[in-house]
């Protein structure tokens, strides 16, 4: 036998692939594809972290996209108007059911304009209820975020917000079991 694929001819490589498939090996499944796939997936996982979505896997996202747009797969979702239907439907669902506030004001601090911050704030409300004292609630939220991200609230990155959303999402799903 040969020790490297480089030493094999194309016929020999295909024989190896066939032998592996015969033993049950399958190629790794590709993730969602297309120009709007990442945004849709991020929103879908956010909805899952808010407790709205029961199935976070790609087939569930694809079923949602098909219901909203009539398009079978995100790889065929090329028209921004079609993508907007699915994106806005997800955002609307999060606003209605989880009270995610997507509005922006000119006096809003930069950190609060980040989608992850908006979702984390909604998660915080789900877990803690409406604030009795807005200032105290904000300080508790700020402390929670900064202790987990090791970063000041005003310097939080999108990636750091993902970690916060995942932590809060675990807590929300634990409550709903």
Segments and roles (model prediction):
Residues 1-177:
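Interfaces that engage single-stranded nucleic acids at replication/repair/recombination sites
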